[in-house]
Amino acid sequence: TFPLQLGSKLCQGKSEHCSITLSLISRFTLMMFIPLVVANARITDFSHANYIPVLDGDVLVFEQRDLLKHSSNLSEYASMIDETQKLSESFPHSHMRKLLEVDTDHLRTLLSVLKVHHRIARSLDFLGTALKVVAGTPDATDLFKIKITEAQLVESNSRQIAINSETQKQINKLTDTINKVINARKGDLVDTPHLYEALLARNRMLSTEIQNLILTITLVKSNIINPTILDHADLKPLVEQDTPIVSLIEASKIRVLQSENSIHILIAYPRVKFSCKKVAVYPVSHQHTILRLDEDTLAECEHDTFAVTGCTDTTHFTFCERSRRETCVRSLHAGNAAQCHTQPSHLREINPVDDGVVIINEAAAHVSTDGSPETLIEGTYLVTFERTATINGSEFVNLRKTLSKQPGIVRSPLLNIVGHDPVLSIPLLHRMSNENLHSIQNLMDDVESEGSPRLWFVAGVVLNFGLIGSLALYLALRRRRASREIQRTIDTFNMTEDGHKLEGGVVNN
């Protein structure tokens, strides 16, 4: 566009021939530049940047989680079972009484599973999930026991939403029906058909509710939410959000609290506040030194950029929680003054970071992407490809067969290096080893340039033997000199005062 604007100004007031010539030149320029852009669209140079931003689709950012609460009072269930057992005696027909007794026994067995009692830990805990699914009994680690009353639980968080109100309403409605039938009896006669149907219906609802609780507690260990405990009428606050309920539930966290006869199931779902672009950030090595990036994921929103943590990928969306602290990487990409630390580079020269994404760090490489001609590059580059890429003879395959990640735009903030952290890593040790081997090789080259290595070896051997011989001769002469000194001292002690030597012999009388 700049050449066109400049040419139009030059051709103002000129003939039509000037405009035609300018148009031809512009077309030729575009024909020259378009192939160059296409050929290098998958290889982006980041050699002079401080970091590499990679766009990784959309992300939903939340600052807090709201709670869904499912509470169950086991003592109420037990009292309903006792009531059914007492009322079963009012039925004259034995088959009705027998069916109700079977129901009450089954409900008591299910209810005993949820009671707080000591459980012996399994030695083979990896069989726990399979055994629990078959038997329907959670083990000791499935229940997070805490002494907390229901009132304290409700007061602890004002954002809690009860989600089992509809089920409880239906159970209470059946209980009211049973009470009406009993109160409407005439003398000792009871409307047994209606009472029997109401008791059976309530037993079925109790059995379903208790089994749902058992399955929910069993799945909590894997952070899987049992959808049967959710009722659409209780999820209206979630429907108000633009995000589908299924995705919110996938990104939720669940915990079970039990106190005496009360079980509370808490589901913490994300309250989405922003819809942004997800940016993955990678460091760039300069002379084997990189910036220390404590957090490597950002959310590039319409008006601001946030550092995010705890990202969860669901079937349709990615959820991330906004980080509260100011980080180096956030300041870098937001274009603010960034206070950063550096550390020794631990990056490999050819580093595949995701499907269809490879980073070349301070290295020379022959690169070919998706069947394109081979290109020689040197420095730090981001290579993206849809199917395959060949780098220095090694082939990389994109298993997804689609290119969902694109290079982002690097900001140019004011970078302040406030410290260097000497972090030790395997790549650093490997690089130090290579440097040592290179130094040794240089030393050997210097020795070879001065003469034959065999000649230097012989000269060294002769010199060593000469030094050893000189040392041995010196020690021998020193030992002989010491012996002479000792002999001279002995001779001195053997002399008399008149200068004659003492000689041994026999004295004659």
Swiss-Prot record:
Positions annotated as glycosylated: N73, N392, N494
Keywords: Glycoprotein, Transposable element
InterPro entries reported in the protein's UniProt record: Gypsy
Any matching Pfam family: Gypsy
Transmembrane regions listed in the UniProt entry: none
Name used for this protein in its record: Retrovirus-related Env polyprotein from transposon gypsy
Species this protein is from: Drosophila melanogaster
UniProt gene name: env
